[in-house]
Amino acid sequence: MRAELNKGLIDFLKASPTPFHATATLVQHFEAAGFQRLDERDTWAVETGGRYFVTRNDSSIVAFRMGRQSPLSGGIRMVGAHTDSPCLRVKPQPELQRQGFWQLGVEVYGGALLAPWFDRDLSLAGRVTFRRDGKVESQLIDFKLPIAVIPNLAIHLNRTANEGWAINAQNELPPILAQVAGDERADFRALLTDQLAREHGLNADVVLDYELSFYDTQGAAVVGLNGDFLAGARLDNLLSCFAGMQALLNTESDETALLVCTDHEEVGSSSACGADGAMLEQIVQRLLPSSEDYVRTIQKSLLISADNAHGIHPNYADKHDANHGPKLNAGPVIKVNSNQRYATNSETAGFFRHLCMAEEVPVQSFVVRSDMGCGSTIGPITASHLGIRTVDIGLPTFAMHSIRELAGSHDLAHLVKVLSAFYASHELP
């Protein structure tokens, strides 16, 4: 099971270079399992035992299985994750021609570790909006091939490079695509028009706009002398999206189960398709006949917010609290913060620990050092919007927000097992 899950995650990561592609890949899996797409613009008629999914902005998805009994009876078991990761996004007018090279201006999306982006074989993917035969359409594209690179400056020209230096995102991050002649004019939209034709056979009249990100073409892999680790891009947080999907597909229960994977977590979630928007609340409201039933159901429900945790690094162990250093391959981590950067409380933490013990899944705890700031997740945001009890958990990871992150190769199976047990559970606290 462990090897099969890791292989599935590696394939999922390869197919999901952007939130748009991640959502499309999730849709493919759910449709293959018999889930029915719902359109938010239509009237819904969900049925007992039915399986459905909804997307918004092509970058967020809510998938759910209606239980054999009403959600009002036993509540809804929810798992939440996010589809986006820190990256470099192409600017609206990106063409740069400097010293005979064609480059693209980029904007840093989220809290990216920038240094690892240098000297990588980069490709480009995302969503393009265009006009064809008088109609406005959108399509996902993925160049797949390594079409760009951000070369480092040689140490001979930067003698203090190994002493640390501030990276200027405006000047130092534009990737190089090609060499151009002095009188040659680079045309990025023409490149996108060609890609639409090459990848989809579409003859666009004009490219109107786009949301495109660079990504590392090196695929994810199981690594280490004994295969202990899983290395790859976007583990934060496609690992949790994949685990939640597997758990939802693997379980049948009398209770209603739901997976929500939203966009824009890395930049605050404040969007129509982010956790700070109304998407999840609006969808759950439509599953219940009245506002009274909605409130009662939410108070019987529970959310597991799944987002990667900081594993204790052997070279930087002093960055962790001495008693709270999560280890790779030692199971999921319950994340706690007294200032509500995580939504965990003693009741929800206790329930998650109970699930892990019942499934013989190891479990750990994380709290940030008292002299350091703490990150956050969709957990507190969703708990605030819905009023739902929430526990923040995640798998321990090294190099979070790097272009290539590292997790334990045993931990995905741990997470899928406990999330499956959660979806199948008959009683919530």
Swiss-Prot record:
The keyword GTP-binding does not apply. It comes from the Bacteria. The keyword Transmembrane does not apply. One of its GO terms (cellular component) is cytoplasm. Its EC number is 3.4.11.-. One of its GO terms (molecular function) is zinc ion binding. It is an enzyme of class 3 (hydrolase). One of its GO terms (biological process) is proteolysis. Zn(2+) binds at H82, H156, H401. Its cofactor is Zn(2+). Keywords: Aminopeptidase, Hydrolase, Metal-binding, Metalloprotease, Protease, Zinc. Belongs to the peptidase M18 family. This is Probable M18 family aminopeptidase 2. It comes from Pseudomonas syringae pv. syringae (strain B728a). The lineage of its organism: Bacteria, Pseudomonadati, Pseudomonadota, Gammaproteobacteria, Pseudomonadales. The gene is apeB.
